[in-house]
Design a protein with these regions (language model features):
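Conserved SF2 helicase motif VI
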Residues: 158, 165-187
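Residue-level detector of solvent-exposed, low-hydrophobicity positions
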Residues: 19, 104, 142, 153, ...
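Solvent-exposed loop/turn segments at secondary-structure junctions
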Residues: 147-148, 164-166
């Protein structure tokens, strides 16, 4: 998805944003109404706004001067870390934090999607710096490594790979002993 978003072939991303704004996504509720119909009142009606939203996502979330493609960077010396960077960008915008990066990279290569795979031997750990105020990481994708326990004040959303696919308590464990969010009054409660 991120690669397609950055590429924006034939205006795909801008058109998708426009569909969201118009409430014509094809995602309907039980009454047959588009779930985004009537939403985004401020943004609706501005004819140029889909393109402006796309440019804003590129700049503020993906740290990309323009569109392009996705670079997946194996951070040498930092086991399990794959940095995500837009073509032409200097900073990483995301981190995939998983156990087996070699197998994951082989899957990406086999997919032949155009994602560039490279190595970065000098970058610091992105995961260790995730709570720093000047971190460039906006997107964190992970797997069972999150069940090991960590604290973060920056997480507002989590993407999980292969968690909770079988019966069991993985999701409960993840939030029971895994992630501690900032919480009320800096309590770091789960």
């Amino acid at each position: 998805f991120l690669h397609h978003l950055l590429e924006n072939k034939r205006g795909w991303a801008v058109k998708a944003i426009q569909k969201l704004l118009d409430g014509k996504t094809g995602l309907v509720d039980t009454n047959g109404q588009d779930i985004f119909a009537g939403r985004f009142g401020y943004l609706r009606g501005r004819t140029d706004y889909a393109d402006a939203v796309y440019r804003d996502i590129l700049a503020k979330v993906l740290h990309a001067p323009t569109g392009g493609g996705l670079h997946l960077c194996d951070l040498r010396g930092h086991a399990g870390e794959l940095g995500l960077k837009a073509s032409g960008a200097e900073e990483y915008f995301g981190l995939i934090y998983i156990g087996d990066t070699t197998t994951f990279k082989k899957l990406v290569e086999a997919d032949d999607s155009g994602i560039v795979i490279e190595e970065d031997a000098i970058a610091d750990s992105l995961f260790e710096g995730i709570n720093e105020p000047d971190t460039s990481v906006e997107i964190l994708i992970g797997a069972k490594k999150f069940m090991e326990g960590w604290n973060s004040w920056r997480v507002s959303n989590m993407g999980l790979l292969n968690i909770g696919r079988k019966e069991g308590s993985e999701i409960i464990q993840l939030f029971g002993r895994g992630v501690r969010l900032r919480g009320l009054s800096f309590s770091l409660k789960r």
